[in-house]
Amino acid sequence: MIIDQRALGFGSGERAVFASDPWTTRGRLFPEAGSLTRSEFQRDRDRIVHTTAFRRLKHKTQVFISPDGDHYRTRLTHTIEVAQIARALARALKLDEDLAEGVALVHDFGHTPFGHTGEDALDAVLLPYGGFDHNAQSLRIVTKLERRYAEYDGINLTWETLEGLVKHNGPLVNAKGEGIKGPVPLPILEYCVLQDLEIGSYASLEAQVAAIADDIAYNTHDIDDGLRAGYLTFEMLEEVPFLSKLMAEVRGKYPVLDKERFANEIMRRQITHMVEDVIGVAQQNLARLKPQSAADIRAADFTVATFSPEMAETDRQIKKLLFGHIYRHPEIMRIRAGATQIVTDLFHRYMETPAEMQSHYWVDSISGMSVAAKARHVGDYLAGMTDSYALRAHQRLFDHTPDLR
């Protein structure tokens, strides 16, 4: 991919005309005085980092549940890696780096314990009450469940950050108002009554680079963790031509290299190639679109920051590799079954006996709720658990807890 370096931003502070402007933000649900020392998007990023939800990411699984090593990624380390890539993309494209980083930092807040397995289990038990969606849960956390301020629930983020959180993967509804990937989660619809996030349009370019940064990070780093865990071998990586080419390049430059450094050199090159591909495609799309404002990005009928067709095919091949050798590995499937049982058991126990929830706030506030509201309340409590907390809760309440090691 050819990149016009003259068109790149290298931290000079210059913003493109299509970048989001923190000084003309659409504001916050609850109006506040501005800061003398920080932009509105800087304040958002800082608020996100200081939440309890951000701290809990440290003990939530990315892929490997209860791993036997300290070097596997958690939701927190993954989030930090996504934020770094998003910020690099934003700088190169002359976007607002703080907004891109903020969306990246908050994008996984709604994830349950035990990764996507926990989300699937919680979605299944909550299906009669609207189901569970981690993006919608992220929105609930930052607009309702975080209790830090005297004047409101949530952390009162700007419209742009909330929009990016909800729409970083694209519009949620089509021109007819129909859900593009199924019904729009109820928490998103409820919030849009208070503050319209315009879920039928694309998000800002800052949100788009956060989304593609997520793809780059988890593809690359799941390979790294898979190699460490022994689920992947270098021979398996040869199945993907792009990775095979990178391996040949590293071997040619460093004929004698230990396995750990060899893997790191592959990962470094993979990230670099993918980032440069996105920058090149975005530049081409911007030249075609000729946007004069952030609104022009939202009004476009396509994603501006994305992979080229060739890199998209590589992305597909990598996902196939990961699904075949890691996500559907018999040992991972065994652990996933145990995690599903833990989440399901806890949900039904708390629905039957809310007093088992070890928090005065969660127990006291459930009084008088309808069954649907009670289920959502229990779902909020479960979704906020870390892996270790959920395990301990199950061990306390049940005679047998699945072994997730």
From Swiss-Prot:
Domain HD: 75-219
A GO BP entry: dGTP catabolic process
MF-aspect GO terms: dGTPase activity
Family matches, as Pfam families: HD (PF01966), HD_assoc (PF13286)
Gene3D superfamilies: Hypothetical protein af1432
SUPFAM superfamilies the UniProt entry points to: HD-domain/PDEase-like
The UniProt record lists the keyword Nucleotidyltransferase: no
Keywords annotated in UniProt: Hydrolase
Alphabetical list of InterPro entries matching this protein: dGTPase, dGTPase-like, dNTPase_2, HD/PDEase_dom, HD_domain, PHydrolase_assoc_dom
CDD domains linked: HDc
Matches recorded under PANTHER family: DEOXYGUANOSINETRIPHOSPHATE TRIPHOSPHOHYDROLASE-LIKE PROTEIN, DEOXYNUCLEOSIDE TRIPHOSPHATE TRIPHOSPHOHYDROLASE
Family: Belongs to the dGTPase family. Type 2 subfamily.
NCBIfam families hit by this protein: dGTP_triPase, PRK01286.1-1, PRK01286.1-3
Protein name, UniProt field: Deoxyguanosinetriphosphate triphosphohydrolase-like protein
Organism for this UniProt entry: Agrobacterium fabrum (strain C58 / ATCC 33970) (Agrobacterium tumefaciens (strain C58))
